[in-house]
């Protein structure tokens, strides 16, 4: 594997928007019994549904442990899904995988961020995380893609969204959290993002969704629809703890312009629920010291914003909620050239995330 010691911006590379053409989507097979109930079996079924939905539109590669390889290979039984053996600590490839960058000469490289399980020993979700910290490099090696390393800089892919035209959206709750990069201030963090993603302007939303155990990842709260347009999780209920968060984000977006000088058009996506795990669902998770516990009294951070854009498709979660049909209609209206496919997302939510968190798109080479 080639490790580069420059930066993507210096070499003419940038992170493309999610709607740019893709060669494939990466996923990791869930099996961790102290995070996924019943040994991960319900989550694996949900994972299969997501992978097969994506495979209708583009190839999928699923990384799986040696112990689960035979099971995963048998269940992911469609030609467009590749299964590769790879050790991991959990399934969140959005956060553990590389961020792919491209240039205008048809090359694809990757940024290999540091990973500390969403906070390390200061609020992190599990320990150890050494196998997860190797995921980015392993994926890039399989793809023979040169990598840029950001040793000493912790970042999860779910904490950023870009428009491919110089603007990045994130949250202060996550990127300025003392359990990520306490040695860096806002300006220094912006400099790292600028150098590695070739962005020129960063929009800082104050917080993400209430009770998001990643410390407020933006991909569960606000995402780009196209340059200059975003989709924001929303509630009109003043009693909902998300109310202040949504309105604070709206204020920032309405008072900001992007790197191209455009004002933002903000579309609203209703928040489902409130959703909670049942006592039985929580009882199915193995209790282990140092791992995030599952509690039926704690509201789940369910969100329709946690969807994935693929070639010609939108893969979005449903929650058996009355708002499911409205969410699908909103997405179809915003993406008229894509087919919106809703996949049951409750089992994924019970593990702490959803479809966008569990996937990582690999952009296709761009050639002028």
Curated annotation (Swiss-Prot):
Q: Which UniProt keywords apply?
A: Hydrolase, Polyamine biosynthesis
Lineage top rank: taxon: Bacteria
Catalytic site positions: 357 (amidino-cysteine intermediate)
Extract the InterPro entries matched here: Agmatine_deiminase, Peptidyl-Arg-deiminase_porph
One of its Pfam families is PAD_porph
Q: Name one GO molecular function term.
A: agmatine deiminase activity
Provide the coiled-coil residue spans. Answer: none
- Catalysed reaction equations from the record: agmatine + H2O = N-carbamoylputrescine + NH4(+)
Its pathway, per UniProt, is: Amine and polyamine biosynthesis; putrescine biosynthesis via agmatine pathway; N-carbamoylputrescine from agmatine: step 1/1
Tell me which Gene Ontology terms the entry assigns under biological process: putrescine biosynthetic process from arginine
This entry's Enzyme Commission designation comes to: 3.5.3.12
The record's subunit annotation is: Homodimer.
Q: What does this protein do?
A: Mediates the hydrolysis of agmatine into N-carbamoylputrescine in the arginine decarboxylase (ADC) pathway of putrescine biosynthesis, a basic polyamine.
Please give the family membership noted in the entry.
Belongs to the agmatine deiminase family.
Its recorded name reads: Agmatine deiminase
Organism, by scientific name, is Pseudomonas fluorescens (strain SBW25)
């Amino acid at each position: 594997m080639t490790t580069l010691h420059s930066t993507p911006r210096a070499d003419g590379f940038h992170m493309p928007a999610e709607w740019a053409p893709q060669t494939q989507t990466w996923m990791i097979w869930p099996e961790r019994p102290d995070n996924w109930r019943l040994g991960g079996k319900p989550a694996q079924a949900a994972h299969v549904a997501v992978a097969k939905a994506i495979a209708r539109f583009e190839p999928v590669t699923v990384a799986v442990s040696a112990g689960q390889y035979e099971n995963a290979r048998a269940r992911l039984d469609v030609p467009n899904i590749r299964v590769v053996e790879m050790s991991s600590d959990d399934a969140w490839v959005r956060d553990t995988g590389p961020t792919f960058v491209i240039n205008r000469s048809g090359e694809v490289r990757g940024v290999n961020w540091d990973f500390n399980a969403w906070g390390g020993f200061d609020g992190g979700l599990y320990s150890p995380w050494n196998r997860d910290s190797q995921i980015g490099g392993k994926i890039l090696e399989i793809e023979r893609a040169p990598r840029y390393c950001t040793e000493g800089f912790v970042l999860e892919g779910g904490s950023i969204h870009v428009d491919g035209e110089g603007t990045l959206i994130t949250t202060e709750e996550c990127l300025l959290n003392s359990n990520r990069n306490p040695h860096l201030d806002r300006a220094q963090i912006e400099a790292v993002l600028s150098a590695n993603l070739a962005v020129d302007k960063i929009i800082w939303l104050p917080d993400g969704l209430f009770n998001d155990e990643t410390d407020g990842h933006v991909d569960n709260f606000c995402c780009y629809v196209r340059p200059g347009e975003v989709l924001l999780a929303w509630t009109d209920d003043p009693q909902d703890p998300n109310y202040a968060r949504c309105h604070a984000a709206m204020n920032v977006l309405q008072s900001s312009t992007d790197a191209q000088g455009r004002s933002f058009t903000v579309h609203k996506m209703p928040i489902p629920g409130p959703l909670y795990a049942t006592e039985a669902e929580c009882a199915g998770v193995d209790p282990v010291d140092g791992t995030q516990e599952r509690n039926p009294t704690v509201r789940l951070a369910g969100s329709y914003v946690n969807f994935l854009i693929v070639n010609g498709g939108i893969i979005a979660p449903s929650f058996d909620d009355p708002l499911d049909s409205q969410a699908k209609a909103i997405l179809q209206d915003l993406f008229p050239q894509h087919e919106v496919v809703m996949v049951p997302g409750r089992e994924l939510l019970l593990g702490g995330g959803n479809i966008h968190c569990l996937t990582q798109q690999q952009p296709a080479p761009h050639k002028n």
